[in-house]
Structure formats: structure tokens, C-alpha cells
Amino acid sequence: MLQIKELCVKYDNIQVLHGISLELQEGELVALIGANGAGKTTTLSTISGVKRAFSGQIVYDGTDITKAGTDEIVKMGIVQVPEGRQIFSKMTIEENLILGAYTEKDSQRQKQNMKRVMELFPILRERRRQTAGTLSGGEQQMLAIARALMGNPRMLLLDEPSMGLSPLMTEQVFDAVKSLNDQGTTILLVEQNAYDAMEISHRTYIMENGVITREGKSSELMRDPAIKQAYLGGD
């Protein structure tokens, strides 16, 4: 579904990604983990068209999207949920969700998508007329994901969804991410909370200093002593 081939990206004159390659099959939940500054967010931003690669290729469903614009990429079914949520705090939950449906012109599908996200996040249904800025951090993260779903994407790019959340809220958000994937949405999950990300994902890529250093089935990598020591708090 998505193939990234030898991707190189710079910020000004500083190279951030050094020829990374990764792929997602349709229906997969794939984790991309690594320390701060490893290049994880840059990877998502380049897939979504916010950043530009100076070499390499991004192919989605057989189409080269390396130089495609953000609007074009969204219309193709790839939506990014950025780090920090970036909701409209003075608007209601319902208004935020409606804004997320701007690519969906069919009013009936909009209603179906609204019903779907309200079922996935019941707390949003209960508070749909509440302003988004009054929600807790975890509830705002749920809203950010729900807003992305209003466009009925085939692939979600999730950037640090657990950032700043309590353990309980983190669990609820990850449960929702797993449920979304179970319903068929392909997900690339960038996350510093390596244990939780690997626990719900099919496969994991590990990134260090703009390079993919390891990849494989999440269940197998979680048993690797070196990875347990470096990322999972193991002995």
C-alpha cells in the first residue's frame, strides 16, 4: 500500500533522513519508534507532503506521491494527526469534527462518519456541544483522531498520540487506535512510548539519527534483549 524507498530529507543544510526505506501493507498497524530527534516526525511530514524529500521515493497504491501536495495526498486517503493535537480550542467538538469532513462532499457519508467516530469515542458524543479547549489532554487527543477520521481516510499517520497523557488516558487512546486498525484502517504510529506502541502493532521499525536500524514483527522485537534494554526498560 505504501512504500518508502531510500528517502533523504534536509532541514536547511542539515540532513535529517538518510536513505530510509519502509513499507506498510493494507490493514497493517506499524510502529515507528526512536528517541527524540531520530527523524520520526519528519518521516510522517514527508509522507503527508508537508516536507519535501531531496531524493528517494514515496509510492502509495502504485502512484508516486513524492512531490504531491498536502491536499492531493489527503484526497488520496492519507491523513496525519500531528503531535500536539492542534484542535480548534474555541470551537465545539461537533464543529471541529465537521471541519475534518471537508474532503467528504456526500452529506450522507458525513453523517455515517460522524456516527462512527461518536461510537468509537463515546465521550465526544456526550460533550459534542462543549468547546474543545475545555477537554482534558486525552479527550483532545481523541478529538484530533476523530477529526481525522471524518474524511474517511484509508491510512492514518499518528504522531505521538500519548504525549502528555496520563497512563489511563494513554490506555484509552491506544485501545481506540487498535480498534480503528481492527476495523480496517491502515496506521503508521510514531511513538516514544515504545512498549505500548509495539504491543498493539503488527510490525515495528526502529529509527536512530535518521536511519532505520532494526525492523521486524513487533512480538519478536519485544523479546530481543538489546531492544528490551534500549527501549522497553528491560534488564
Say what each PLM segment does:
Residues 1-235:
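Glycine-rich phosphate-binding loops of nucleotide-dependent enzymes
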